[in-house]
Amino acid sequence: MMRKQLISLLICGVLATTAVAGLAGCGGGDNSSITPTETTVKLTLWGASEHQTMLGEMVTAFKAANPNTTYEITLGVCSEADAYTKLSTDPSAGADVYAFANDQILNLNRVGALARLGGDNLEAMKSANGEGAVNAAKIGDGYYAYPYSSDNGYFLYYNKSVVTDTSSLDAILAACQTAGKKFVYDLDNAWYDAAFFFGTGCTYKVTYTADGKAEESVACNFDDATKGVAAGKAMINLAAHSAFMNGGDDELKAGFADGSVAAAVSGTWNATAIQGSLGDNYAACKLPTFTVDGTTYQMSSFAGYKLYGVNPYSDFLAEAHKLAAFLSGEAMQQKRFETFEIGPSNTNIAASEAVKANVALAALAAQGAYAVAQTAVPSGFWSAVETFGLEVCAKTVTVENLSEKLKTMGDSIRSVANS
């Protein structure tokens, strides 16, 4: 359960020896090793909708591993992408433990939604995970999350009986068109649209205030007359192709299942479903190139991590840390890999033969050479690029007004939300 105010405001310094949650707020120190005194520990855990069954099994395993404590753990639905949105207005009303994508870590910290790790929890997290994942949990000189996945990126899935040349977007679209099938791309999703802009060389850079909690300035050239225009034209061309279908996870999985889709861009979380649909024709590889006005570009992508955050407003802070550590531990990362082929951040599992032989993870690794780390993303990026993508899909962005639309997007990205 969550309280509107940290319990420390009421009893810190008065019942210092027993008020565990209160100590979490006194002085801002780490309390991840404190043991709660309550008989029944009540926690709320947020996770993606498609992971609810698996999370229920993980919670059962957690309870079995801690038989001397009585837990009441409630599951809630919140995708990793939506964690900051749900917590930004009132983190005290949020879950005790929640999953999030690493690009949100600064904003989550800014609104006070992340408890700092310390003691054995910190040392275990740092020793078990890869360097990139550990750094994704870091803000300044502290660590504020538990990594559980290093596969937050995307690549190409395809039916190899239909698509035989995956080197270029044109070749993929032509193969789909000839076979009367579709290529699915989430063109009104900023996360995927970045592939075109990064591919043509567009960049951004955020300068933060000294405490890391606010944007001081944002530089961005997504509206560049050459690079930005090339990316925009590529998106316009894709949206106009008869073999293109705009869609996300549900559309591409349904399309592979019924045979109407022959290629799609997504991540490892859909590997099991797509492989089940395609069988022997299942294949995956890095993203293709695209050509605009005679110049060929390699599609880029975001590369990121997924982590568990612990809400400092938890009434059972130490137990919330214990749950987050368990869910991100080696055994549960192994379960995620076996259930959804989610790429582990745990170094032992990542080095296993099963992971090395995985088709989707191999494709993700190949795409990694062209990926941009999903860190320090401007706060205005997501809504601005999504709006541009929506307009491309609606065909209200044309070659004639492209520069104007790009400038509107660029100005929105460069705006500093906290100024």
What residue spans do the PLM features occupy?
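Extracytoplasmic/periplasmic substrate-recognition and gating elements
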Residues: 276-339
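Conserved N-terminal structural module of periplasmic/extracytoplasmic solute-binding proteins
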Residues: 8, 19-20, 26-104, 411-419
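Hinge/lid segment of periplasmic solute-binding proteins
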Residues: 102-154, 167-173, 283-286
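Conserved C-terminal helix/tail region of periplasmic/extracytoplasmic solute-binding proteins
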Residues: 365-419
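Ligand-binding "clamshell"
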Residues: 108-116, 140-142, 202, 274-297, ...
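A structural signal for short loop-to-beta-strand junctions that line the ligand-binding cleft
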Residues: 88-89, 93-96, 124-158, 181-185, ...
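Glycine-centered hinge/linker elements that transmit conformational signals in sensory
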Residues: 212-246
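Extracytoplasmic/periplasmic solute-binding protein
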Residues: 144-148, 154, 172-220
